[in-house]
Amino acid sequence: MKKRILVTGGTGYIGSHTVVELQQSGYDVVIVDNLSNSNADVVDNIEKVTGIRPAFEKLDCLDYEGMDKLFTKYAGIEGIIHFAASKAVGESCQKPLLYYRNNLVSLINLLELMPKHNVKGIIFSSSCTVYGQPDTLPVTEAAPIKKAESPYGNTKQINEEIIRDTVASGSPVHAIMLRYFNPIGAHPSALIGELPNGVPQNLLPYVTQTAMGIREQLSVFGDDYDTP
């Protein structure tokens, strides 16, 4: 019997690529996404790439009762990969409370529901922003955690502490935290990639959307940094 994995934010950029890799590695995947920054068509494209249609539920991880019912519906989930989060640094400075609610409560709900439904493991999508302004480059896991420079970065720092405290309390939950830098690119099939809803909050979607003709031009601000 295939092992079942829940991927939150599974129609997003990193999430969709992870779902493809999981399915191609023989896992049974359940996707949860509220589609706030992605499109349900991604599920169709995942099926085109892998030949397997993952289970998909349009659901917000903030909805505790909804998530509780999901774990019951898809009994036997063995692990969670938690990507679902608000992720734009600039926007987090404008809407800090939105980021604290979305990014903290969603994780807390999962950590509370995991023991109830006998889910043992979680991989948490953290961020390189937890390092603040590092003393040296390149940054390694041994680098000290510095003061976060945005509410987004602070939510990732706090979430890591929540996970550490939960595990240290004797909870049966096992956790891994992955601190990503800036992923770019798309699947070789070009069926999945980074195509956020609305105005992109980071550079690469602007570049690709301009190349595709979705946007008329790409603005470059400043003239004091030589481009190699």
Question: What is each stretch, according to the model?
Answer:
Residues 2-79:
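N-terminal Rossmann/SDR dinucleotide-binding element
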Residues 92, 144-145, 181-228:
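A conserved pocket-lining segment of Rossmann-fold NAD(P)-dependent short-chain dehydrogenase/reductase
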Residues 78-81, 123:
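N-terminal Rossmann-like NAD(P) cofactor-binding module of classical short-chain dehydrogenase/reductase
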Residues 94-97, 101, 105-112, 116, ...:
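Catalytic helix-loop patch of NAD(P)-dependent Rossmann-fold dehydrogenases
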Residues 38, 86-90:
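Active-site beta-alpha loop architecture of Rossmann-like, nucleotide-cofactor-dependent enzymes
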Residues 28, 53-55, 174-176, 217-219:
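Conserved beta-strand segments of alpha/beta enzyme cores
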Residues 4, 28, 120-121, 174:
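Residues at the starts of beta-strands that form the adenosine-phosphate
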Residues 84-87, 126-127:
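Conserved NAD(P)H cofactor-binding loop of Rossmann-fold oxidoreductase domains
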